[in-house]
Amino acid sequence: MADKADKMKARLPRGFVDRVPDDLRAAEKMMATIREVYDLYGFEPVETPLVEYTDALGKFLPDQDRPNEGVFSFQDDDEQWLSLRYDLTAPLARYVAENFETLPKPYRSYRNGWVFRNEKPGPGRFRQFMQFDADTVGAPNVSADAEMCMMMADTLERLGIQRGDYAIRVNNRKVLDGVLDAIGLEGEGNAAKRLNVLRAIDKLDKFGPEGVRLLLGKGRLDESGDFTKGAQLPEAAIEKVLAFTAAGGADGAQTIANLQAVVAGNAKGEEGVQELADMQALFFAGGYEGRVKIDPSVVRGLEYYTGPVFEAELLFDVTNEDGQKVVFGSVGGGGRYDGLVSRFRGEPVPATGFSIGVSRLMTALKNLGKLDVSDTVGPVVVLVMDKDTQNLGRYQKMVSDLRKAGIRAEMYVGGSGMKAQMKYADRRAAPCVVIQGSQEREAGEVQIKDLVEGKRLSAEIEDNVTWLESRPAQITVREDGLVDAVREILDAQARDRAEQSK
């Protein structure tokens, strides 16, 4: 036996989580519904590798000031730098560029998968998480952007989120870029300062207008004493940006009118406002008014967005770690990124897309009781009473017969006795167990114990003698009637679950 000092400690790397069966089933249940909606809209699945050449991913990580900071990278044997993907959009751009001549244009695709960020982990902030994206490449018109917003609204409703409990919020980066140009932040030389402004605006929901004012200026001191350096804008520029964020009106038409006043005289900003007006008309035509709204506070952190940007926000309250009621907030977002594919092609390739944060949306659905997998039925467990080869073969045939009938089943393969096997079956959430000892075998019979009914009856029968005499929820059947008897038990349990859920 190894010395205790030589034992390796089992530990999970920081920022990563293990996923247990219920989480996996819940995620698959949710993603199956998302796929149904995306398929309904005519999108096709595609999958790209976890690893890409680092230069193919670009320099677009959110909240990072240095190129490719925050990416897990390594060199291969050719000394080429490779990185784990940090989102699903940059790999899609590479895929489309590499297969451009064979793909239909516009190219409509969806994909889900793991992405990785080499960032400091914290509560709710992981280094590995799953996204579910849909994108249209090759469509220059904002009808493609509007469709993304409408598809996201339909997806949330298909998942059981009621109208009024969510909003798809829409803005246009051209409008914001027009404002930034007007205050002297145009050009690549001001990229870092523009990013600071975006970060400040993105904190509007958290800190309010006055907090954003501080972040646009010299900086903000929070309650803990930590100081966040601001964007160092002059007062006139701060007022211009705050006027932009405050342009939201009672409805889309009023918001658009307010934005027109903010960007009047700036061609880029006016173009962005017109695109929002066109999208608003499409939302009304499709019956999405009230579900999708124009909101100037939506900025999205990624630098590659070039036009409309959108965010899916859940509006119901949840209790945070401090016991306070807070709005759940964003579960996904996206926008137009006309420059990503163009990097590879050397010609304009318009594109737009939407990304769902799978884990965050799962949390929301669980809070609403819309993703319950507690009724998952475990396997029927065939207990092993005799371990000689001949009898093991007999138990194995029972399992095979059940599986051929489409019934999930397993033979106990551990080394424990009857009591431990029953405990194992209980932990596996087995609906019933199959028992055949020497007496049953000689009679050509099997015992089937309904564990679900047994638990229910055990709560009603308090006297141990009565319990032993009644042998509740246990039947004996001919061996050749095993499958039919098990199916009857499973069907009865299914009816009970359906009745209880009403």
From Swiss-Prot:
Enzyme class: ligase
Species for this entry: Brucella abortus (strain 2308)
PANTHER family on file: HISTIDINE--TRNA LIGASE, HISTIDYL-TRNA SYNTHETASE
Gene: hisS
Catalytic activity, EC: 6.1.1.21
Family, similarity comment: Belongs to the class-II aminoacyl-tRNA synthetase family.
TM helices/strands, residue ranges: none
Gene Ontology terms, MF aspect: ATP binding; histidine-tRNA ligase activity
One GO BP annotation of this record: histidyl-tRNA aminoacylation
The protein's name: Histidine--tRNA ligase
GO CC annotations, alphabetized: cytoplasm
CDD domains (alphabetical): HisRS-like_core (cd00773), HisRS_anticodon (cd00859)
Pfam family, one: HGTP_anticodon
Record key words, sorted: Aminoacyl-tRNA synthetase, ATP-binding, Cytoplasm, Ligase, Nucleotide-binding, Protein biosynthesis
InterPro entries: aa-tRNA-synth_II (IPR006195), aa-tRNA-synth_II/BPL/LPL (IPR045864), Anticodon-bd (IPR004154), Anticodon-bd_dom_sf (IPR036621), His-tRNA-ligase (IPR015807), HisRS-like_core (IPR041715), HisRS/HisZ (IPR004516), HisRS_anticodon (IPR033656)
Annotated catalysed reactions: tRNA(His) + L-histidine + ATP = L-histidyl-tRNA(His) + AMP + diphosphate + H(+)
Assembly mode: Homodimer.
Superkingdom of the organism of origin: Bacteria
Compartment(s) of residence: Cytoplasm
